[in-house]
Amino acid sequence: HYQEIYDSDVPVEKLYEYVIKSNKDIFLDIANHYWSVEKKGHYDMAVNISFIMFLYNEKLTAAKLISNISDDIKKDCRLSKEQMMDYNAALTYINAFLDYNDFTKMNAQFIKVADITNKPLKHIAGHFPFSFECPSVMSIYHSSPGALDYETYALEECASNYYRITNGHGKGFEALMKAEVLYNRGEIESAEILCHKALYMADGRNQYSIYIAATFIMTLISIYKGANDEFKEHMNNMTHITENTSYLPQHMHKMTDICKSYIYSNLSSPDNMCEWLKDYKQLELSINFHSLGFANIILGKYLILIGDYHKFLGISGQFLGLNHIYSYVISNIYTYIYLSIANNETGEKEKSHKFIMMAVNLAMPDRLYMPFVHNYPYINMLLDEINTAKDISLFVKNIQRLSKPYEKGVKAINKAGRLLADYGLTVREADVAKLAAKRLTNKEIADQLFIAESTVKSNMKMIFNKLEINSRAELKNFFD
């Protein structure tokens, strides 16, 4: 049984789909039988299993396997020099991940890979999503408060070498990290430019996880700007990738679910969030361990939105415990914000102040405002109440400054969405109505939407009926 498993050559991308909590004991059992099977010059599955042990955070087992496989390879006379080199390069690459998420230490191992072989890695690299189906590179690689600029620089420094040894795996991740940092600091235009750069880099190498993640940040930017056309375009692009790309792995569908549910949570639309992201047990069983911290941000916001404060307080310890394992700063900031909201809503004002201060203290050294902006309607009074100390007043002012356009943007996106939902307008009718509200003629609308003028006329009739209006002038009541 175990011999057959270790003799097989199932690639790691096929196994990755099954690396979820419910299968952990099976993979651990396979790992522990490495020493009881004959190798016969075949180590592909053993290399895969050592990487899977990292994915399960079983670092001791992973390290032991890497060491023993390396020793066995040296003694195996069936292997050619080239095969030995390929396996050793793969094991060194996996060894780098035992220092996850310190990219400076990881890069030291990646440099060793380049010393072992001058060709791209054959095993592991490029066969799993760079950010483990998490759309936020920053959330998994920001692990030290006050060190975000250094962490971003470390990713940028190692990018060219990493791309060389992996044949472009995760292409665009350094631009994406910078874009996300800038977005969270409220530097919206600069963030958008870098998102376009990340999209271009990822698209050239079919790096779908980076492409989806960049589209995700651009969707958040469109909410800030209140740009509904851009919002719809980005949401549609994410759907298009998952529905129209041949052989797209299941984890990419999960990633899109995570993106959309996060976005809908920011729009206070819990009904539009994916069901599997609303239940802690199902979530824990469905998602990669490294992405769980970010997914918990979504679940936490869902519980806040539906007012289930006691449930959130009950599971928040598990959130914090997971964040502690990898020092996930972003997930901790959100968890402390939610703890502040939940305690405030349940009458624990002192605890509420304590937790909002903990969130501020984690975010302030790196000027991370957007976690607070995303939750501003719940915490504006709390921020006023703690804003007595001079050292946080500038930080709070910047949150307040960014919250005004953001809340306006949320209202604009929700208003546009309600036109479709509440009044039954089709997407085309909404597009026509919006242009008509700007006083464009039927011909101008037809030219802009590439449709016949007669189609505009028939759409206008339907719009008037559905909105129960008699003139174009009344459209301004529905569109700003």
Language model: regions and residue ranges:
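Extended alpha-helical scaffolding segments used for macromolecular assembly and cargo binding
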Residues: H1-I52
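Alpha-solenoid helical repeat architecture
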Residues: Y2-I5, G41-A46, L79-A89, P120-V137, ...
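Short coil/turn connectors between adjacent alpha-helices in alpha-solenoid helical repeat scaffolds
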Residues: K14-D25, M53-K64, A96-I111, M138-Y153, ...
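Structural register within alpha-helical repeat arrays
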Residues: V10, K14, I49, N95, ...
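Internal alpha-solenoid helical repeat scaffolds
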Residues: N32-A214
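Recognition helix of helix-turn-helix DNA-binding domains
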Residues: A421, K438-E474
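Alpha-helical repeat scaffolds
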Residues: I26-Y34, T61-D72, T104-N118, L148-Y162, ...
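Linker/hinge segments immediately adjacent to helix-turn-helix/homeobox DNA-binding domains
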Residues: I298-L305, H310-N332, Y338-V427, K443
